[in-house]
Amino acid sequence: MHYENNWESLNSRHVPDWFADAKFGIFIHWGLYSVPAYTEKGQYAEWYMQQIRDENSAARKFHDRVYAPGTQYEDFVSGFKAELFDADEWAQLFEKSGAKYINLVSKHHDGFCLFKSDYAWNWNSVDVGPHRDFCGELKTALEKTDVKFGVYHSVYEWFHPLYLKDPEEYAVKHLIPMLKELITKYEPWTLFTDCLLYTSDAADDLIGVD
């Protein structure tokens, strides 16, 4: 089915039959925040980078107690080795569970990507840390099963200079190009974009928001 870049055409699309019948999928939060792997009850461990900015938070107290003085979130790159990660093992487990699709967090609000991105130089799992393309590895492994590969992608990044300066400029120069890169490179069956960031200038030409 071909859709035009107007709202009437985009709104005419229907949920794919496979997704309506899928019933069960698996959402995978795994990234740099998995190194400290900490949060207080009722909070999100993947928000660790943000939480330790608050001097009074439980995460900050944990951080100061466990890690050397001056340790920054960015320093966790050296500890993100993923030496036990086996994409085929994951894929087989997902299929055995009965899941019909998965969504891997390709990038969370910390901006760290689990794929090589031209828009996240030196802040992705290929350039630094484990030096592996986890999106690519998992997609390839899942193609040997009946489980469909999908991705989650954070719309905004807490401390990206462009986002802090001008969210619309960030969307046009960083977010949308990275999304196009991700979709073109991996052709995911599902794309889950998280958090509201809407730029009226480019939206009609580039994206559909639902």
What kind of region is each of these model predictions?
Residues 198-203:
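Conserved small/polar residues in nucleotide/adenosyl-binding loops
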Residues 2-104, 109-111:
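N-terminal structural segment of carbohydrate-active enzymes
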Residues 4-7, 11, 149, 183, ...:
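Aromatic-residue-lined binding/catalytic grooves and analogous aromatic/hydrophobic interfacial grooves
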Residues 70-86, 117-132, 162-172, 192-197:
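The substrate-binding groove and active-site-proximal loops of carbohydrate-active enzymes
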Residues 103-112, 153-161, 176-197:
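Active-site groove signature of glycoside hydrolases
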